[in-house]
Curated annotation (Swiss-Prot):
Keyword RNA-binding: no
Protein's name according to its UniProt entry: Caspase recruitment domain-containing protein 19
Gene3D superfamilies: Death Domain, Fas
Function: Plays a role in inhibiting the effects of BCL10-induced activation of NF-kappa-B.
Keyword Disulfide bond: yes
Cysteine-cysteine disulfides: 7-77
Ranges annotated as spanning the membrane: 122-142
InterPro entries cross-referenced by the UniProt entry: CARD19, CARD_BinCARD, DEATH-like_dom_sf
Amino acid sequence: MTDQTYCDRLVQDTPFLTGQGRLSEQQVDRIILQLNRYYPQILTNKEAEKFRNPKASLRVRLCDLLSHLQQRGERHCQEFYRALYIHAQPLHSHLPSRYSPQNSDCRELDWGIESRELSDRGPMSFLAGLGLAAGLALLLYCCPPDPKVLPGTRRVLAFSPVIIDRHVSRYLLAFLADDLGGL
């Protein structure tokens, strides 16, 4: 297995990074400032001004920056990846060089990040479901046992443990045990 250098990875990732909408202007500016201001200083002030020139298009500036870093050597490319990780972590995790068959070590390091991600529904979906369940429980608790008010509710809830997890079904069956005898 051959180890890819950071310069090789940058050559492989350049078309992906320069693609439309991948990096915003603010992210590119932050990366350039990171390479210019923090130790080790990769870009001089003059180079940073050149790559931050608002008169040139973002794609041209980014292509110039990446080719400049490739010419400067391995350390410069490594610092670019470090700055990219800091300022555009979601993009960094989807780079083509991280998923190439030559670079299987990155796959081993990447599995932990994906396992901690939330589902695409997010926390509001969880809170909405929890609120719905709490509201239904409160309605059943406060509702009088008059059969005219909710005639089929107890029958529907009697079959819901089939769908609900077994831990919850124990409590639901215990709650309904008194009312099932009268059905």
